[in-house]
Amino acid sequence: MKYVFFIILFFLIFTPSCNNQNQKIEDIFHKIETEDAKIISAEIVNNNTFNIVLSEVVEILEFSINGEENKEKILGKEFSFPLGRTIEMGEKVTIALTYRKNGGNTTRAYFTLYGKNTRKANLLINEVSIKGTKTLPDRVELLVTKSGNIAGFELTDDLDSTPLTLPSLEVERGDIIVIYWNSKTNKEDYIRENGKHTYFLSGNMANTLISTTGALILFDEHDGTIVDGILYSDFSSSDYGKDKYEKCETLLVENNEWYGEPISSEYVTASRVLTRLKGGVD
C-alpha cells in the first residue's frame, strides 16, 4: 500500500493542471503538443462572400453574420460563406466564428469587415475647424481631387479610438464634403457657382476635435492606406492631447505623409480655420 500511495502522490504532484483558458495543452503521456489553429486571412470577396483561411484543419461549429447564426458543422482549412446578399460599399458587417481543432480548444473569433469600395475617389483634407461653438461646431472639409465614391474612407484624430467612417456617396472632382465632426447638421447639399457640389454629413462623434495640439488622419479604408493628414499645435506647454498627437505624428512621419513642424493653431477661432487653399477652392 505504501508503494501505491507513493505512485498516486507522485502523479498528483507532477501532473500539470488543465485550464480551459490555456492556449497550449501538453499531453504528458505522449508528449504531443496542441495549439489553437491560427487565422491566416479573413476577407470579404466581391462584397457577397466571406472567405477565411486557417493554419490547419478545424471543425466550424457556428458561423453568424450580423447576429444571424448558422450552426451547420463543416470540416476544413479554407472556407467560403455567402453573406446572403451583396453588401453596399463601405457597409459594416460583423461576423462571429466558432471553431475547434481536433484535440484542441474551442475558439470564438470576431471580425468587423466592410464592403469593398471598388471606385474610390481621391480626397484631401482642405479645412479643419478645431475651436467650434454651438452655432459654429467643429467641422472637417474634404476636397475631391478625383471622381469616385467615398464609401469606407475613415477619419480619425485618435488612433486608439473608433474612427469616423464615411458613407457611400458618389462625388465628382472639385466637389466639397463638409463633415460636422461631433454634431448633426440639417444643412442641405447645394451646387456652387462653378457647378460643383457641396455635401454636408453628420459625424456625431463622441468628442470634439482637440483645440490646441492635435492631428487628423484620413485613411482610404479600415486599416488601409493613409491618403492625407495634418498636425497642428499652439506650441503651449500643455500636455492635453499630447499622447494622441505623438502617436499620429509618428505614423504620419513614418509613412512620409508629414515633414517639419505642425501647423500653428495659435490664432484659430470659431470662424478662423486651418486651411490648405487660401481663399477656398472656388
Predicted regions, residues:
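Short, surface-exposed alpha-helix to beta-strand junction/turn motifs within ectodomains of secreted
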Residues: 51-73, 153-155
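A structural motif detector for short, solvent-exposed N-terminal "entry" segments of globular domains
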Residues: 19-33, 40-47, 105-161, 208-210, ...
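Buried hydrophobic-core signal for structured, non-transmembrane domains
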Residues: 50, 138-144, 214-218, 274
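C-terminal motif of bacterial Sec signal peptides marking the signal peptidase cleavage site
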Residues: 14-17
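Solvent-exposed beta-edge/loop recognition patches
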Residues: 86-89, 168, 172-282
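Positively charged n-region of N-terminal signal peptides that target proteins for export
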Residues: 1-4, 20
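Residue-level recognition of beta-strand termini and adjacent short loop/turns
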Residues: 46, 75-77
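Extracytoplasmic/surface-exposed domains of secreted proteins
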Residues: 50, 54, 63-65, 79-105, ...
